[in-house]
């Protein structure tokens, strides 16, 4: 999938339409609003403090440098989900990408996360990425279920590797799979509930 395929309209399971688009600098204020509105529970173990201007500056720079590609999902004109593909452009892990996915609680369970991840997996294939990984902690039960449905499986568990914003330690779970397997699983899932797709 090339950038020209976005924005597009995705039909969710509840019949609503979400607009998917590549994140741009013009989305800065909305992205901060989205992340600052997340509950502390949801932000507790995120890899970065996504509520700060410093994080946003670094995120936008990663987009400019091609080290990250982000897709935002909007419902009723407001961001309700965001997914990012991170990659290393040089070195021995340049064939590996990392996906991070966050969906507002009000929009969960309707397939928005799948719709956000789908174009990123296609972009990973187009850019020669062979393997995708996702990091989460042991308490993120919903995240584990989501990534398992997307075709990921647990490859490693690192005890006490993550310290949350309150200083409590958590086990880090590393989920991964070959991009081709993830793509096949996602296509099968999308075929179950998305008979068509409208683009604009």
Predicted features along the sequence, with ranges:
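Conserved GNAT acetyl-CoA-binding A-motif
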Residues: 117, 124-136
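Helix-loop element at the rim of GNAT/NAT acetyltransferase active sites that forms part
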Residues: 33-47
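Short acidic N-proximal helix/loop "leader" segments that mark the beginning
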Residues: 1-14
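Glycine-rich phosphate/pyrophosphate-binding loop shared by adenosine-nucleotide-utilizing enzymes
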Residues: 16-18, 76-82, 170
């Amino acid at each position: 999938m090339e950038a020209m395929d976005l924005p597009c309209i995705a039909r969710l399971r509840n019949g609503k339409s979400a607009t998917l688009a590549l994140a741009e600098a013009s989305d800065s204020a909305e992205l901060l609003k989205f992340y600052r509105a997340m509950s502390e529970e949801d932000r507790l173990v995120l890899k970065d403090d996504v509520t700060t201007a410093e994080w946003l500056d670094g995120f936008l720079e990663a987009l400019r440098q091609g080290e990250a590609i982000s897709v935002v999902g909007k419902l009723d004109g407001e961001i309700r989900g965001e997914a990012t593909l991170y990659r290393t452009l040089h070195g021995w892990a340049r064939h590996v990408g990392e996906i991070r996915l966050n969906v507002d609680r009000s929009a969960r369970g309707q397939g928005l996360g799948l719709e956000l991840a789908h174009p990123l997996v296609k972009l990973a294939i187009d850019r020669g990425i062979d393997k995708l990984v996702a990091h989460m902690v042991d308490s993120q039960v919903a995240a584990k279920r989501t990534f398992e449905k997307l075709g990921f499986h647990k490859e490693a568990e690192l005890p006490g590797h993550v310290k949350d914003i309150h200083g409590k330690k958590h086990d880090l779970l590393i989920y991964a799979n070959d991009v081709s397997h993830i793509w096949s699983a996602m296509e099968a899932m999308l075929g179950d509930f998305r008979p068509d797709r409208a683009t604009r």
